[in-house]
């Protein structure tokens, strides 16, 4: 059984579950994967609580322990910034936790040439803590939007998705995407799990899967989860 620690935010956790189901293509109810979604929406905000490391760790760990007690074979966390706490969570949890940034990196190796520019759209917390740099700096050059675009467009789009204002979020994120394309990025990581919802708003699942520009961590993590579930 797959354990999903969600609630960061709720829309992002549901987006992951939706992609997990669509990837599976079960012909009957019984053909779909068993999973537990713990929508733990009371976890303190990650980007604004980086300095309260232990407080956030405790809440995340409680979520992982809940899933472990419910007999989950492994755990996934559809939140990029939460992976700042990944190492301590894995040390204190008795089942594997799949690392989202690592899976995105392993996917990128297959899609991009060494030293390629890869754009990263993410929370300021994800950028500051380097959860993607930890992997990508080995083979790629990560590129970010300038500060004004980060503040006016990326942060705004993330907030709008959390508020359920998807059309507004889709409009807000466009200048950030265009700026990274102008910087000749080969791919763009949607490094906050709210952002695929904004980018792919109202698009079919087939178009999401075939995107040549964007790397969707939720979709990549869902693929990795299905492989591990079936192994």
Residue ranges and their predicted role:
Residues 1-231:
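Non-catalytic structural scaffold of enzyme domains
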């Amino acid at each position: 059984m797959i354990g999903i620690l969600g609630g960061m935010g709720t829309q992002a956790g549901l987006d992951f579950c939706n992609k997990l189901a669509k990837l599976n293509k079960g012909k009957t109810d019984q053909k779909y994967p068993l999973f537990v979604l713990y929508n733990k929406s009371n976890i303190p905000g990650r980007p604004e609580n980086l300095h309260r490391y232990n407080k956030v760790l405790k809440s995340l760990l409680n979520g992982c322990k809940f899933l472990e007690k419910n007999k989950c074979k492994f755990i996934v966390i559809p939140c990029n910034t939460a992976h700042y706490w990944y190492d301590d969570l894995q040390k204190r949890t008795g089942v594997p936790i799949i690392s989202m940034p690592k899976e995105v990196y392993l996917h990128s190796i297959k899609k991009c040439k060494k030293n390629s520019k890869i754009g990263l759209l993410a929370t300021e917390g994800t950028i500051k803590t380097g959860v993607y740099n930890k992997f990508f700096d080995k083979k790629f050059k990560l590129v970010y939007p300038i500060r004004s675009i980060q503040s006016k467009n990326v942060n705004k789009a993330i907030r709008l998705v959390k508020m359920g204002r998807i059309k507004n979020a889709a409009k807000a994120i466009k200048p950030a995407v265009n700026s990274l394309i102008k910087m000749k990025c080969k791919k763009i990581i949607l490094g906050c799990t709210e952002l695929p919802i904004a980018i792919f708003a109202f698009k079919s699942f087939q178009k999401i899967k075939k995107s040549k520009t964007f790397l969707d961590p939720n979709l990549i993590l869902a693929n990795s989860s299905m492989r591990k579930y079936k192994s």
